[in-house]
């Protein structure tokens, strides 16, 4: 049988926890993320040229302006802390079903910042060890 490669992005996190994580904490797609995660206070004294609400556009502009290095560091820290605190819900998620539908010949590559895929992987490992590789 042929190997499968599955690439996951922000939409996968949204699909995995549409009602929030184990404690109701919500995720966000890139557009509007700053507001949805309550990070607006970081940009109060920042003058952005971009009119985009996409965090990738905002982050790119902040990184190009040396006067905002402290804002970038704080934004990175708060984003990391926010996503790192997610806990997978008790009922199986789409991550569980995806992992269990693949085998050790397959690969799941993710660009997500949260630990949900890894948490689902650990949970699925209690059922079988014939699991896909994670990148």
Q: What does each model-found stretch correspond to?
A:
Residues 1-120, 125-129:
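Gly/serine-rich nucleotide phosphate-binding loop at the start of the catalytic core
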Residues 130-135:
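Acidic, His- and aromatic-enriched active-site or binding-groove loops in soluble protein domains
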């Amino acid at each position: 049988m042929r190997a499968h490669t599955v690439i996951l992005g922000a939409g996968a996190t949204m699909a995995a926890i549409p009602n929030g994580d184990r404690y109701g904490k919500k995720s966000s797609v890139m557009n509007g993320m700053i507001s949805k995660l309550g990070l607006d206070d970081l940009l109060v004294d920042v003058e952005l040229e971009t009119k985009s609400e996409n965090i990738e556009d905002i982050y790119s502009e902040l990184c190009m302006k040396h006067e905002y290095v402290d804002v970038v560091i704080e934004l990175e820290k708060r984003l990391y802390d926010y996503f790192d605190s997610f806990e997978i819900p008790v009922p199986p998620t789409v991550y569980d079903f995806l992992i269990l539908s693949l085998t050790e010949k397959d690969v799941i590559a993710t660009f997500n910042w949260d630990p949900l895929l890894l948490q689902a992987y650990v949970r699925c490992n209690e059922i079988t060890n014939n699991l896909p590789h994670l990148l």
